[in-house]
Each structure stands twice: as structure tokens, then as C-alpha cells.
A protein has these predicted regions:
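N-terminal adaptor-interaction module of cullin-RING ubiquitin ligase components
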Residues: 1-111, 116-119, 129, 133-137, ...
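Phosphate-coordinating loops and pocket residues in cytosolic domains that bind phosphorylated ligands
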Residues: 14, 266, 294
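Inter-repeat linker/turn residues at the boundaries of leucine-rich repeats
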Residues: 29, 67, 89, 100, ...
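Conserved hydrophobic beta-strand positions in leucine-rich repeat
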Residues: 44, 72-74, 92-97, 117-123, ...
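Short, solvent-exposed loop/turn at the beta-strand->alpha-helix junction
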Residues: 50-58, 76-84, 100-108, 126-134, ...
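Eukaryotic tandem repeat interaction scaffolds
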Residues: 174-283
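Residue-level detector of alpha-helical secondary structure
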Residues: 289, 293, 322-325
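Leucine-rich solenoid repeat scaffolds
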Residues: 299-335
């Protein structure tokens, strides 16, 4: 290992499970020194690890190393609030995706303890509600990354606090947050001007009027999949403010037409586009291809385009598309 540079050493150690990493650390002084120098002992990532008596082992790791850890990834682990209670203010990155035995008390502990938190993921935890989330929003002022995908019990009681307490948030995933209202989204996109990622996948009841007042000039990712209320007129208004989009998912937004593409991508607008999904939109025709190919930036940057079930695009054969957009390698998107 002495011959490995720091980058190679880091990649090697990151592939080792946490317990083995610590055995190495306390077996060899040189390895210990490099692990500490590169802060590799600060990361607890158990995504690809499975232990016998796992909950007990995770608890002991959190207890023993709580004053070292800055990043914990415990997604899909069967942990509970007792594990969360070992979190300290050292943590800046927490991934609790699908940890379905935690509840609002866990969020309240994080809010009261982890004031340096910048990254929080809470994918599909049905027991969570506004009671816990509002504490996170009000007490974790450094938070810029928030994944709430599949948490269906959040609503105005917490999400309306985002613009006031987290105006600099950059990443927000609200997929299947069925308590989300148009009022919430309108306030968020008007005041959270640093947003780069906004996911509103599978929220068909949103009226989409927020697009007329969007103020997120740095937005790079927007997912509106499945919304049949969004229209060309919404994008006509939004196109004045959205000019840095890289990934746009409009799958099954069936009221859209070529006009949306014209508003968003003509005259070299949004020239950094890398991915676009228009899956299932009958209002899209060959004119859309013409608009995209006349944008020189898109001609170079586009690598993914989904035209599946766009039956009014007559020339949508993969070879034909590839001949126009040389860097396209993917023709169907799965979000």
C-alpha cells in the first residue's frame, strides 16, 4: 500500500467494509496515518455491507466512533431511534433512505444536534411528518441537499418554512410528496434562488402555475413526470428564468407540444442540455428534433433523449437520432 498515491489508496480503502478498515487502522501505523490524513475514518457507509447481528454492530460503531464520524450512510438498514440518538454535531452528511423504523423523534434529535448538517436523505419513511421535518428546516441552517422522496405526509406545515429558513438550498426531491401544494412550490421556486435540482415526479395534482414565477436561474435538473396540468404557456413564462437546464424529464406531460421545446431551446437557449425525456407526449413532432439540432450546444452535449411513444415524431429511429446527435447513447429514461 505504501506505493499507492492518495487517490488510489482512498479508492482501495473505500471498498473495504467499516470494521475491516478499523482493523487495518489499528494494525499498521502507516495505514492509520494515511487513513486519518485523508479523513477516511470519518465515513460510515454500510450500503454494500451485511453483518450478522447487524443492528447491534451498527449501534456499537456509532457509539464508539461518534466523535469521529462526519458522514453516515445507513440506507435500507433496520435501525431505529436508538441508533439516531448516537448522532453528534460532527455529522454533515446523513443518509437514512428507507430506514422505516425511525420516526419524528429521530428527526427532532438530528435537528437539535446536527447543526452542521448539509446533506439529508429520507427516502420513503412513511412515519415522518411535518412535526419532525419543520425542526430540521428551522434548526439546520447549512442544509443544501434534502431528499424527501416518497414521504407522503409532509405538507404546508413544514415545506412552507423552506424559503424562510433554507433559502440557499440547492437540491430538493419532493417525489410523491402528496401533501405538497401549489402554494408551497410557488414560494420555494420564488425564494430559493440557488436551487439546482428540483424533482416533482408523480405529483399529478399540481397546477404548475409556479412555473410562471420561477426564479431559479441556476436550475439544472427539473422532473415534472406525469403532470398533465403543465402547458406550453407555463414554459413560455419559465423560459425567461430557466436557461441552464441539463436534465429535463417531461414524460407523460401530455398537454405539451413542440411549443415548449421552442420556448426552452430555440436560439441557443439551455445549450447545456444533456438529457431530455418526452416519453408519451403526442404533441411532440419532428419539429422538436429540428429545434434541438439547431441548438449548437445541444447538438454537442445531448447524450440521452427519450421519444418512446411519441408517435407523431415520424423520424425517431435510434440510428436516425444518433446520426444527428453524435453523443447520444441512451434512448429511454428510467427514473
Amino acid at each position: 500500500m505504501d506505493k499507492l498515491n492518495d487517490s488510489s489508496f482512498s479508492k482501495l480503502i473505500e471498498r473495504v467494509d467499516y470494521l475491516t478498515k478499523y482493523e487495518l487502522k489499528y494494525t499498521c501505523k502507516k495505514i492509520k496515518s494515511r487513513i486519518e490524513k485523508l479523513h477516511l475514518d470519518e465515513i460510515l457507509d454500510l450500503r454494500n455491507t451485511k453483518y450478522e447481528n447487524e443492528n447491534n454492530i451498527i449501534y456499537k460503531i456509532l457509539l464508539k466512533h461518534k466523535n469521529i464520524l462526519t458522514k453516515v450512510i445507513l440506507e435500507f438498514k433496520d435501525i431505529n431511534n436508538s441508533h439516531i440518538n448516537k448522532f453528534t454535531d460532527k455529522l454533515t452528511f446523513i443518509n437514512l433512505n428507507y430506514c422505516q423504523k425511525i420516526d419524528n423523534d429521530a428527526l427532532i434529535h438530528i435537528a437539535n444536534t446536527c447543526h452542521n448538517l448539509t446533506h439529508l436523505e429520507l427516502y420513503i419513511i412513511p412515519s415522518l411528518s411535518d412535526e419532525g421535518l419543520k425542526e430540521i428546516i428551522m434548526k439546520c441552517p447549512k442544509l443544501i441537499y434534502l431528499n424527501l422522496s416518497g414521504c407522503s405526509h409532509f405538507g404546508e406545515g413544514s415545506l412552507l418554512l423552506l424559503p424562510k429558513y433554507l433559502p440557499k438550498i440547492e437540491f430538493l426531491d419532493l417525489t410523491r410528496n402528496y401533501g405538497l401544494t401549489d402554494k408551497c412550490v410557488e414560494e420555494i421556486v420564488k425564494e430559493c434562488t440557488e436551487l439546482k435540482y428540483l424533482n416533482l415526479y408523480a405529483l399529478p395534482k399540481l397546477e404548475m402555475n409556479f412555473l410562471k414565477n420561477i426564479n431559479c436561474i441556476n436550475l439544472e435538473f427539473l422532473d415534472l413526470c406525469g403532470n398533465q396540468n403543465v402547458t406550453d404557456e407555463h414554459f413560455k413564462k419559465a423560459s425567461d428564468k430557466i436557461n441552464n437546464i441539463k436534465k429535463l424529464n417531461l414524460s407523460w406531460c401530455t398537454n405539451l407540444t413542440d411549443k415548449t421545446i421552442e420556448y426552452m431551446f430555440s436560439m441557443d437557449k439551455n445549450k447545456n442540455l444533456e438529457l431530455i425525456s418526452l416519453h408519451g407526449i403526442l404533441g411532440i413532432t419532428d419539429k422538436t428534433i429540428d429545434i434541438l439540432k439547431n441548438n449548437k450546444g445541444i447538438l454537442h452535449n445531448l447524450n440521452t433523449i427519450d421519444l418512446v411513444a411519441c408517435s407523431n415524431v415520424k423520424n425517431r429511429d435510434n440510428k436516425y437520432i444518433k446520426n444527428i446527435f453524435k453523443n447520444v447513447e441512451c434512448f429511454q429514461v428510467f427514473f
